[in-house]
Amino acid sequence: MRTPRRHCRRIAVLAAVSIAATVVAGCSSGSKPSGGPLPDAKPLVEEATAQTKALKSAHMVLTVNGKIPGLSLKTLSGDLTTNPTAATGNVKLTLGGSDIDADFVVFDGILYATLTPNQWSDFGPAADIYDPAQVLNPDTGLANVLANFADAKAEGRDTINGQNTIRISGKVSAQAVNQIAPPFNATQPVPATVWIQETGDHQLAQAQLDRGSGNSVQMTLSKWGEKVQVTKPPVS
């Protein structure tokens, strides 16, 4: 039988994980490849929008820089797929002054997590808590962030996970930000930066939403379109 204290702790942790997952850091490099004049930013954002809308799988890494009220996450890393919808990964967060490291799996619509090390628990339908694969939802996920990216301006070249990218600054509508990152509670356009492959498919390599005062959420995508295999974990 679950004790009330343990049950409450599970609910609190799962809430933190679900909030973290809605916002999907990046493994970025400070190097800046040399090159000629910077390309026009708007076409790159449009290309990345189309690519991200069509994306069915990817590896996602998220880091919270600074502090954002309602978000106890430190990092989240996972492989996501929408065909079929599934996810597997790890989340690190701070709750009640304690550091928590938990693995999670979404399989056949059910969310599993190891709130106790090496012990998988069934938390029921992922849709009732959060399905991390919805980060790839073309209507509310990262594709929607790009579709609502305004005032795009190419700022420079950076290498992200070995990819040569163009760093583009701009602003994202409050509605798009709140759909992917509810803790922002944005009421006006949010300053943002995206890193898009300069050549090739122009995939989105990284995105950052800034909340001010050095606080931000930074998201990285890689392994675009690669097969993601998720297996059902053994439940204790």
Curated annotation (Swiss-Prot):
Q: What is its main location?
A: membrane
Keywords on this record?
Antibiotic resistance, Cell inner membrane, Cell membrane, Cell wall, Glycoprotein, Lipid transport, Lipid-binding, Lipoprotein, Membrane, Palmitate, Secreted, Signal, Transport, Virulence
Name the reported effect of V91W.
Decreased TLR2 agonist activity, cannot acquire lipid from mycobacterial extracts, cavity entrance and size decrease. Binds PIM6, LM and ManLAM 10-100-fold less well than wild-type, binds de-acylated LM and ManLAM as well as wild-type
Quote the InterPro entries the UniProt record gives. Answer: LolA/LolB/LppX (IPR029046), LppX/LprAFG (IPR009830)
Please list the GO biological process terms of this entry.
Answer: lipid transport; response to antibiotic
> Which PROSITE patterns does the record associate with it?
PROKAR_LIPOPROTEIN
Lipid moiety-binding residues (S-diacylglycerol cysteine): C27
* Molecular functions (GO terms): glycolipid binding; phosphatidylinositol binding
Q: Where is the signal peptide?
A: 1-26
**Ranges where the record places region Prevents bacterial uptake by a human macrophage-like cell line:** 81-100, 141-160, 218-236
- Annotated Gene Ontology cellular component terms: bacterial extracellular vesicle; cell surface; cytosol; peptidoglycan-based cell wall; plasma membrane
What's said on domains?
Forms a U-shaped beta-half-barrel with a small hydrophobic cavity (1500 Angstroms (3)) which holds a triacylated PIM in 1 crystal structure; the 3 acyl chains are within the cavity while the sugar moieties bind to the protein surface. In the structure bound to triacylglycerides (TAG) 2 of the 3 acyl chains are buried in the cavity, the third is solvent exposed. A flexible lid region may move to accommodate different TAG molecules.
Q: What function does this protein fulfil?
A: Helps membrane protein Rv1410c (P55) transport triacylglycerides (TAG) across the inner cell membrane into the periplasm; TAG probably regulates lipid metabolism and growth regulation and plays a structural role in the outer membrane. Binds TAG in its hydrophobic cavity and transfers it between lipid bilayers, probably to the outer membrane in vivo. Binds di- and triacylated phosphatidyl-myo-inositol mannosides (PIMs), and glycolipid lipoglycan modulins lipoarabinomannan (LAM) and lipomannan (LM), facilitating their recognition by TLR2. A host TLR2 agonist (toll-like receptor), shown experimentally for human and mouse. Inhibits primary human macrophage MHC-II Ag processing via TLR2. Both lipidated and nonlipidated protein act as TLR2 agonists in antigen-presenting cells, although lipidated protein is more efficient. In resting human CD4+ T-cells lipidated but not nonlipidated protein is a costimulatory ligand (with anti-CD3 and anti-CD28) for T-cell proliferation and IFN-gamma and IL-2 production, leading to increased expression of early T-cell activation markers, TLR2 and NFKB3 phosphorylation.
* Additional note from the record: Bacterial LAM blocks host cell phagosome-lysosome fusion and is one way in which M.tuberculosis evades the host immune system. Triacylglycerides accumulate in lipid droplets in the cytoplasm of M.tuberculosis stationary phase and dormant bacteria, and are used as an energy source during starvation.
Family, similarity comment? Belongs to the LppX/LprAFG lipoprotein family.
**Protein name from the UniProt record:** Lipoarabinomannan carrier protein LprG
In its UniProt entry, the species of origin is given as: Mycobacterium tuberculosis (strain ATCC 25618 / H37Rv)
Q: Identify the taxonomic lineage of the organism of origin.
A: Bacteria, Bacillati, Actinomycetota, Actinomycetes, Mycobacteriales
- Which gene codes for it? lprG
